[in-house]
A protein has these predicted regions:
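An extracytoplasmic/periplasmic, membrane-proximal ligand-sensing/linker region
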Residues: 2, 34-36, 180-183, 220, ...
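N-terminal export leaders
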Residues: 8-12
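N-terminal signal peptide c-region/cleavage motif recognized by signal peptidases
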Residues: 24-26
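N-terminal (or domain-start) structured segment
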Residues: 28-119, 158, 166, 182-209, ...
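Extracytoplasmic/secreted proteins, especially bacterial periplasmic and envelope-associated proteins
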Residues: 51, 55, 59, 80, ...
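Hinge/capping helix and adjacent helix->loop/strand transition within the periplasmic-binding protein
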Residues: 87-93, 108-195, 244, 249, ...
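A ligand-binding cleft/hinge motif common to bilobed small-molecule-binding domains
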Residues: 103-112, 171, 178-180, 207-239
């Protein structure tokens, strides 16, 4: 009999605690947000995550009635920002905006990673996707991807390509393309697109992958030529430029930009931000503004965001193996 009353007492305590948590959660959701929200950005001002974050932050602030600030913490391919995010208060007022490399590439190439995606973070929302474009210098005698493939196979190792750094999406996209088609093209890594794109324009390398905003001015001036993009389909920004997937079915390395929170962040905060981000992604002016920058708005739920990260981990893991990159 005593055990019966003990069990009943434990059950009642649990019920009371659960009810208290439910009330607390409901109160939080009703009041949220009641102070400024901060977006930690993994890259410097002007980069892809920064561009996307600022456009969304402005609309998010208008919809929530609270300031949404942007805090750039570039360095180590997003590791600096991710570490700061993992240590930030888990109160629903700090989020991180990053491209997929923070969680899909870094764990594959770094031995000293201090964070773990599944342990330390939770997906909130997809925000955008930005295809990279394969661009060549005008002196490169190839007017389309098939001609470039033929040229590379005729001159094994004779052509060069630049990238924004070893292990970058620019690097891994080309390595996957090379492996898929059996090409030998020499890699010349640079420290960011601020170095790699000028190297292409100056003829120091024959080709590279980069985002449209960093190339479009040189395309218009005739200093570089676009041959293909690395997304699953043609982009509305450059509909005459084919997707590599038209030659290699399933080829898709277009980087995503998404919002994440630290594990332990209130579910109500995550749900609210996710819902608002999805609504913002459908705003015509947001779609157009991003499109003008060569970026596609793609609102997506927390579950869709999480799935996209896992898909990138799988896809880029294969590319890292193909490139022979060892953890350092």
């Amino acid at each position: 009999m005593e055990s019966f009353f003990r069990a009943r007492r434990t059950w009642m305590i649990g019920m009371v605690a659960g009810a208290a948590l439910a009330v607390t959660g409901a109160a939080f959701a009703q009041a949220y947000p009641n102070k400024p929200i901060k977006f930690i950005i993994t890259h410097a001002a002007g980069g892809l995550p920064d561009t996307v974050a600022r456009i969304y932050a402005q609309r998010l602030s208008e919809r929530l009635g609270q300031p949404v600030t942007v805090d750039n913490k570039p360095g180590a391919n997003g590791m600096v920002a991710a570490q700061a995010m993992a240590l930030a208060p888990k109160d629903g007022y700090t989020f991180m905006v990053t491209d997929g490399s923070t969680f899909s590439i870094n764990p594959l190439i770094s031995k000293s990673l201090s964070y773990d995606y599944k342990r330390d973070f939770v997906a909130v929302s997809l925000a955008a996707r930005a295809p990279l474009y394969l661009a060549v210098h005008p002196k490169t005698p190839a007017n389309n991807l098939r001609e470039l493939i033929a040229l590379a196979k005729a001159k094994p190792g004779g052509l060069t390509y630049g990238s924004s750094g070893i292990g970058s999406t620019h690097h891994l996209t080309m390595e996957s393309l090379k492996a898929s088609l059996g090409m030998e093209i020499t890699h010349i890594p640079f420290k960011g697109t601020g170095q790699s794109v000028p190297a292409l324009v100056g003829g120091q390398v024959d080709m590279l992958f980069s985002a449209l905003p960093s190339l479009i001015g040189f395309v218009k001036s005739g200093q570089v030529r676009l041959l293909a993009n690395n997304a699953a389909k043609r982009s509305t920004q450059e509909p005459n430029v084919p997707a590599i997937a038209e030659i290699i079915p399933g080829f898709d390395f277009a980087p995503i930009v998404a919002v994440f929170a630290a594990s332990g962040t209130p579910a109500a905060a995550i749900e609210r931000i996710s819902t608002e981000m999805a609504a913002i992604a459908k705003m015509p002016e947001v779609v157009q503004t991003l499109s003008n920058a060569g970026i596609e708005a793609i609102g997506g739920s927390a579950a869709e965001c999480h799935r996209a990260v896992l898909e990138e981990v799988d896809r880029l893991g294969k590319a890292v193996a193909q490139a022979g990159i060892q953890k350092e």
